[in-house]
Every structure is written in structure tokens, then in C-alpha cells.
Amino acid sequence: GIITPEHSSMTWNGDAFPFPSWEADQDLNSAMQNSVNWYFQAIDSQLGINRVQEFLNKIEYGNQTTSSNLDLYWSDFSLKISPLEQVTLLKKFNTNEFHLNFQNVFSVKNAIKIASTPNGNFYGKTGTGRVNGQDINGWFIGYVETSDNSYYFATNIQSDSNATGKKAFEITSDILKKLHIWN
């Protein structure tokens, strides 16, 4: 692989980015926490379009469609996935039905862990689709593990503006609280 649990650091090249958190060296945890596109684009670039496509096919990620530009397929809306497909994929990832390296799965789970209490663990990842400076597509996917169950979710909000991953997170958190799954 391009990165390993022990070696996931990448050096920022000094380019200006829209978010200050992107203008720093990154590792898997910081890149996941801040959705640092350049970090994941660098991995994709090193993998190449064929290996990226093979992986999307292996994990049956949505429509498995990539544009020919590795820098854009996440943001040009050629790659599409439904909330139900997100939940199915996340459950298969969490139970390692894809037969990935256990340490890599563990590293990703650690990178998306939001909170831990004696009652369980809360995992999730936000995402925001921005077009022409407007946040039009907000995602929050994740799961809660308790001693006796796992609860998977995917929240997607769409609007002409202000549809962010943060808002999807807030909606999901309210629902989980009302259902007494996570406080």
C-alpha cells in the first residue's frame, strides 16, 4: 500500500488551500478529521486510476464510476452512492467482509472515532460537496457500537446552499439521542 498504520505522514507542498487545516503536514488521522483532499488525491495519484477503479469495484462503492481525472472523481459527481449503499459498505468494512489488512481497518476505525464511553464507541465521517462556492451536499456516515449492538447510519442533505457535513452530523446526533442510542 501507499500508506501503512505506522507510516501515513505526508508533507504539505506549500500550496494555498481554502481551509487553514489543509495547509500543514498530514497523517491519516488529521486528513480524515479535516477532509484534506490533497492527502487523498496524493494517495490516488500514487495508486493510479486502474488500482483506484479496482478497489472501488472490489468494495462495490456506489456506481463505481470515476472520471479520468483522479483529482476530481470525488468532487465532480461522477462517483455516486446512496445512503443505503453507504450503510451497507460501512457495515461490510467494519466486519471486514472485504478481507482487508486488519491493521489498516483498525487504523481507519481509529481515524473516524468521534467518541468513546463505557457504554460504547461512536464512529463517523462528514463530507461536504461544494460547487461554485456553495455547500450543496452534506453527508455524515458512521455507526455506534455498544456492548450488545451496532447501529449504522448515513445522513445526506442537499440544498442550494448551507448543506454541510456538519449539519448532517447535527441532524444525526439529534436522532441518535432521541432514539437513546448515543448521548
Locate each region found by the language model.
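Active-site SXXK
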Residues: 1-10, 31, 153
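Extracytoplasmic
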Residues: 5-7, 23, 38, 56, ...
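Surface-exposed patches in mature extracellular/periplasmic domains of secreted proteins
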Residues: 5-12, 43-44, 64-70, 97-105
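Acidic helix-start/capping segments at beta-turn-to-alpha-helix junctions
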Residues: 8-21, 30
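Tryptophan-centric aromatic hotspots in well-structured domains and transmembrane helices
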Residues: 12-13, 74, 139
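Mid-domain, small-residue-enriched loop/turn segments at the edges of structured enzyme/sensor domains
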Residues: 20-24, 28, 40-95
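Short helix- or helix-capping micro-motifs
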Residues: 28-35
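Structured C-terminal helix/loop/strand segments within mature extracytoplasmic catalytic/sensor domains
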Residues: 45-50, 91-183
